[in-house]
Curated annotation (Swiss-Prot):
This is DNA-directed RNA polymerase subunit beta. Belongs to the RNA polymerase beta chain family. The lineage of its organism: Eukaryota, Viridiplantae, Streptophyta, Embryophyta, Tracheophyta. It comes from the Eukaryota. One of its GO terms (molecular function) is DNA binding.
Length: 1108
């Protein structure tokens, strides 16, 4: 929330601000910090030195973002850094080093990697610093303090049951704290002087032990004792003290402190605040006085004076943004560059020793692709770099505003307990208490509240100042989780109380992480907006306060799954945030300058002001990651005058600058012949032929033509039906605009048969010799569905483009340096076996499919009410109102009271009142104005609509909110009045065309030889447990035997059964055990159990033992 003092108004911050600010901070400051802190590298003789300059350059991308999507490339910029080589402290030579490519973030806060949009999810980890805890055991209490370093290392101090103080290195290794003190260079006088609670050391005989004093008097001796107590002994279980061993242990101890005791600036800040220290923030390593203060406070906690920490509190957690993650990866890449340069210098020194003369530094590789490799690995494999959910614009924003508790340095799904997943009071105004995934990640993935911001790694929330003694301070104050503990903050779902009403003198307030009722005079701050606590998805749900939290969670998640419809429609009932979501999504085309529209068509808008021409390119039928349509429709006519910031074109699922995810349709809550039982939904055929829920989906087909393998693209495909090739042009490519069916060829390809084909099928060689056929094989690309071809992209694969190197020539003095970098870059690509002649070609075919709603599709509302279409009724059979209008959808009324999402009823009735071209924008928690405010508003609007339309059935006093409707089949009135109205219904991405899957034969598991599970593996057709129960209930023994043996996992029998079915013969019996039975016997054998059976002859009663 931002406050403009001149206009005295508040504005909600941009929803993508956190991502954009984080990446800008990485480019401007974090990269600079890495190059400034890059150490000077020198050889052993100090003859050659290398160091980076801080004036790095990032070249503008040579390709547009749209072209990078088509060519499946990464939208990135090349990074060039000046470096200096100093020879014998005299000769100084400057070189420009190419360090790789850095992917760029677009205006939506996402990255384009290999033609796919990806997003880096923010992470919440434990903040570096010191944390105190109490472990209760049967024998007594153990007080511990854990020091978390900046790189994630931990150091644990503890007071055991016997009041002894230890530093624990691992679970089984601990050292006395006094030994650690002496190893850090302290003596007994300094320890006693700087420790307030000296009684904590009285239990030790160490202070009075003269022998131990003498042994620990020297620092190296203390370090020796430190590792001796850790158990670092040789094979003979004895330490042999020597100077070389002492030096080795000293280096080991120094490395130990640098790895586990590096606090960083944030850790130093937290340590100073917790222990009341005054050490500068630039001192990022642990000091001896820090350890003294840590132990002193630990003793204080054991006496009950200090307080233990709650690790789930947000003040103890750090927000890891995209800048922090990228900075960490660049640091790893620069470390590899450092090793590369050191190895090169060692090679030069060896050459110098062999030739016995001074050698100038030869061609050190002026190109290093370490940053490219590291960032490629990060964006491709890191768990926080995720494939962008792009079903609609709301899904993009919500995905970029997610915060993960998982990932490196965070929690794990298995070890995260209920306490870590639960809602903490410090989340108030920072994390949404509702929006989280369903399933095993529940509580581990959070979503930012709409007004939260990041400051120095911590989340802050704005509050309005109402205290009289703070009137001269700012009206809007951002408080961190550690600051709002000391203030009384009134909740946002209440208004300024009327002191004349005794019942309203106390206000619900948050104070010291608890929710209390406090008088208004004692309030310091208050929330300024009821939506301040929630995420964007939850804030779009009207009448949110009347829904159960779990249903609000489902409604928020299902809005992300809504498919953009062909004809978007504004919701009649909303919350007022729809325009802000559309504006910040990046899907709108916004005017960048004031002027008059000179030219406008479906793809381009040109505006002119005082001779300055601005051209805006629109998205035309582009594919998203979820195969939905991304398209912009212009509503800026020619010669129209526009202002800066005015909307020129709407994006997908948008209308008039507002996000429109669904359609306003007429619904009724009533049972209908059992077709809407449970979550089934009955719809009218009007939704189909009026294209109410019709959506476009774009599928991308891709194929590669490798000319190195003599693969070619052609229309002449032998032994293939001409009908399937009817859409190909002379080059073998499908024509744009063609209507293709499943099985039609999109790209005609031929390649020579390999030697493996002839060895696998010898008859191919015989046919070639007999009939003189050409040894070729068709590898055509075929369509899997029907649709219209809207685009064909035929491009050649190139390893890189050197044109952007020329853009670095900003100074004449550096032109020759960039020429050297260009030559070195070409050498590196040749060494990596990149073929610069581009011997491969790639073809992308985009198929547009128009999908109407049908049986099996999933639809939902914004209140967690979801269901599957079970039947499509004709218009005349649908129930109709007293005005003759037939219903569009019939929902089950039993789904409302059991799930406690009454908000859909308020929306439905208010939507009926808003059919007279009215739109309502109602923020949640309107009950803060008066009791039953929502109900009064709905009934009042219904009463007004009844009078304006002269339809008394809209508002009937006998049954408020209900009306009598007629059966479309008989024309009779239903016995009971029914709740009817206009609800905003969404069509979800879960559609029957994508879910339907069937197979006859397919892949089998290697061990059990049973069909694999899942559509993605090509599996299916399994006889499950419930199907076996059904067969058992009917007693079909022979069918059960077939299904469980010869038709399941008997390899030889299931091959014979197909032939027997075709020939009409009886089903063959299994002559041996099935594969799953063999697996069972082997598992029993592994348990030392032998499985066998015995046959008893009926005539002679002989025993014949047969092993399985």
């Amino acid at each position: 929330m931002q406050f403009d003092e001149k206009k005295e108004m508040f504005t909600i911050p941009e929803f993508g601000q956190i991502q954009l600010e984080g990446f800008c901070r990485f480019i401007e400051y974090d990269l600079l910090d890495k190059f400034v802190k890059f150490p000077k590298i020198a050889n052993t003789q100090k003859e050659v030195e290398f160091l980076f300059d801080k004036n790095y350059k990032i070249i503008e991308p040579s390709i547009k973002e749209k072209d990078a999507v088509y060519q499946r490339l990464t939208f990135s910029s090349k990074l060039f850094v000046p470096a200096f080589f100093i020879y014998w402290n005299k000769i100084k030579k400057k070189k420009i080093i190419y360090l790789g490519e850095i992917p760029l973030m677009n205006n939506n806060g996402t990255f384009l990697i290999n033609g796919n949009y990806r997003v880096v999810v923010n992470q919440l980890i434990r903040s570096p610093g010191i944390y105190y805890s109490l472990e209760r055991k049967r024998t007594g209490n153990i007080y511990t303090s854990t020091l978390i370093s900046d790189c994630g290392g931990r150091l644990k101090f503890e007071i055991d049951i016997k009041q002894n103080i230890w530093i624990r290195i691992s679970r089984k290794k601990n050292v006395s704290i006094l030994v650690f003190f002496f190893a850090m260079g302290l003596d007994i006088e300094e320890i006693l002087k700087n420790t307030y609670y000296i009684k904590g050391f009285e239990g030790w005989g160490l202070i009075c032990n003269e022998k131990l004093k003498h042994k620990l008097s020297r620092k190296k001796g203390a370090i020796f004792t430190f590792y001796e107590e850790l158990g670092s002994r040789g094979d003979n279980n004895d330490f042999v003290f020597s100077e070389s061993l002492s030096e080795s242990l000293y280096k080991k101890f120094t490395n130990f402190l640098s790895k586990r005791c590096k606090l960083g600036r944030i850790g130093r800040r937290n340590l100073n605040k917790k222990l009341n220290l005054e050490i500068p923030d630039n001192e990022i390593f642990l000091l001896p006085q820090d350890v003294l203060a840590i132990i002193d406070y630990l003793i204080k906690v054991s006496y009950g004076v200090g307080t233990v920490d709650n690790i789930d509190h947000l003040q103890n957690r750090r927000f890891f943004s995209v800048a922090d993650l990228l900075k960490k990866e660049v640091g790893l890449a620069l470390n590899r560059v450092k090793v590369l340069i050191q190895k090169t210098m060692q090679t030069i020194e060896m050459l110098r020793k062999k030739q016995n003369k001074r050698i100038m530094l030869p061609e050190i590789p002026l190109v290093s692709t370490q940053i490219t490799k590291t960032l490629k690995h990060f964006f491709g494999l890191h768990p926080l770099s995720q494939f962008l959910e792009q079903t609609n614009s709301l899904a993009e924003i919500l995905h970029a505003r997610k915060v993960s508790f998982l990932g490196p340095g965070g929690l794990t799904e298995r070890t995260a307990n209920f306490r870590a997943r639960d809602i903490h009071p410090s989340y108030y105004g920072r994390f949404c208490p509702i929006n989280t995934p369903e399933g095993q990640n529940a509580g581990l993935i959070a979503s930012l509240a709409i007004s939260a911001r990041i400051n120095f790694g911590f989340l802050e929330s704005p509050f309005y100042n109402v205290a009289k003694k703070y009137q001269k301070a700012k009206k809007i104050v951002y408080l961190s989780p550690s600051e709002d503990v000391y203030y009384r903050i009134a909740l946002g779902n209440c208004l300024s109380v009327d002191q004349k009403i005794p019942e309203k003198k106390n206000t619900p307030t948050q104070y010291h992480q608890e929710f209390l009722s406090i008088a208004w005079e004692q309030i310091h701050f208050r929330c300024f907006l009821p939506l301040q606590y929630f995420s964007i998805g939850v804030s779009l749900i009207p009448f949110l306060e009347h829904n159960d939290a779990t249903r609000a969670l489902m409604g928020s998640n299902m809005q992300r799954q809504a498919v953009p419809s062909v004809q978007p429609e504004k919701c009649i009932v909303g919350t007022g945030l729809e325009g802000q979501v559309a504006l910040d999504s990046g899907a709108l085309a916004i005017s960048t300058q004031e002027g008059r529209i000179q030219y406008s068509d479906a793809a381009t808008i040109v505006s002119v002001l005082k001779g300055n021409t601005t051209q805006t390119e629109l998205q035309i039928y582009q594919r998203s990651n979820s195969n939905t349509l991304m398209h912009q429709k212009t509503h800026a006519s020619q010669a129209k005058y526009v202002r800066k910031g005015q909307i020129l074109a709407d994006g997908a699922a948008m209308l008039g600058g507002e996000i429109c995810l669904g359609k306003n349709i007429l619904v009724a809550y009533m049972p209908w012949q059992g077709y809407n039982f449970e979550d089934a939904i009955l719809i009218s055929e009007c939704l189909i032929y009026k294209d109410i829920f019709t959506s476009f989906h774009i599928t991308r087909y891709e194929t590669t033509i490798c000319t190195a393998e003599c693969e070619k693209m052609t229309r002449e495909i032998p032994r293939l039906a001409t009908y399937s090739l009817r859409h190909l042009d002379k080059n073998g490519l499908v024509r744009v605009g063609s209507w293709v069916q499943p099985g039609d060829v999109l790209v005609g390809k031929l390649r020579p048969r390999s030697s493996e084909d002839f060895s696998r099928f010898p008859e191919l060689r015989l046919l070639q010799d007999l009939f003189c056929t050409s040894p070729i094989k068709e590898t055509c690309l075929r369509a899997n569905g029907k649709g219209r071809v809207i685009d064909v992209n035929w491009s050649k694969l190139q390893a890189f483009c050197k044109d952007d190197l020329e853009k670095g020539h900003q100074d004449d003095d550096t032109e020759d340096i960039y020429d050297e970098a260009e030559d070195a870059l070409e050498k590196v690509y040749q060494l990596n076996n990149y073929n610069l002649s581009s011997d491969s070609e790639k073809v992308h075919v985009y198929l547009l499919e128009k999908r109407k709603i049908q049986v099996g599709d999933k639809v939902a509302g914004r209140h967690g009410n979801k269901g599957i279409v079970s039947i499509v009724l004709s218009r005349q059979d649908m129930p109709f109102l007293q005005s003759g209008i037939s219903l569009d959808m019939v929902l089950n009324p039993l789904s409302v009271p059991s799930r406690m999402n009454v908000g859909q009823i308020f929306e439905c009735l208010l939507g009926l009142a808003g059919t007279m071209n009215k739109h309502y924008r109602i923020p949640p928690f309107d009950e803060r104005y008066e009791q039953e405010a929502s109900r009064k508003l709905v009934f009042y609007e219904l009463y007004k609509a009844s009078e304006q339309t002269a339809n008394p059935w809209i508002f009937e006093l006998e049954h408020l909110g209900k009306t009598q409707i007629f059966d479309g089949r008989t024309g009779e009135i239903f016995e009971q009045p029914v709740t009817t109205g206009n609800a905003y219904i969404l069509k979800l991405i879960h559609q029957v065309n994508d879910k339907m899957h069937a197979r006859s034969t397919g892949n089998y598991a290697r061990i059990t030889q049973q069909p694999v599970q899942g559509k993605s593996k090509g599996g299916g057709q399994r006889l499950g447990e419930m199907e076996v129960w059904a067969l058992e209930s009917f007693g079909v023994a022979y069918v059960l035997r077939e299904m469980l043996t010869v038709k399941a996992d008997h390899i030889r029998a299931r091959k014979k059964i197909l032939r027997s079915i075709l020939d009409g013969h009886s089903v063959p019996k299994a002559d041996s055990a099935t594969e799953s039975f063999r697996v069972l016997s082997k598992e029993l054998n592994s348990l030392a159990l032998e499985l066998n059976h015995t046959i008893i002859s009926g005539k002679y009663f002989n025993l014949d033992r047969i092993e399985v």
